[in-house]
């Protein structure tokens, strides 16, 4: 609810909590078990997110939803060892889509690679299927997750003939 991504985190957290409140009130929980949505304020700080996980994992977690790629990267080995699901909706480690390797990480409905592909497909659609010679720029922050789409965009550049500007 605070930090650099508060503008997106606040409404998400509100709706997430409201959904589980609705399940409790309407359905008596999930399978008869009432749900709780404990929150930890991380300010998008990875260390605080890991501290939150460590302090709450023993409370019978159904799933963790950190809303932070940095926190997600640090939690992947922990949730795998602890057998707790991690939902990283639209962010997180893209390669975690391989469920044979990452058994407790679920990054649906999309990830950074999907997003890059969708953007290029949109450009193809709006340019008659041909973007050869066009310039596509990716503005990103200098972090592991900020760089996640680069390889996909490079591969698609080779396939479709556009110039990638980073």
Which sequence ranges carry the predicted segments?
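Extracytoplasmic "Venus flytrap"
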Residues: 1-17, 41-46, 68, 139-148
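Short intrinsically disordered, low-complexity coil segments enriched in acidic
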Residues: 1-8, 24, 36, 165
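Signal peptide-proximal N-terminal region
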Residues: 14-37, 129-131, 158-162
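Structural motif
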Residues: 33-58, 116-118, 166
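Extracytoplasmic ligand/sensor domains, especially the bilobed periplasmic-binding protein
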Residues: 47, 61-165
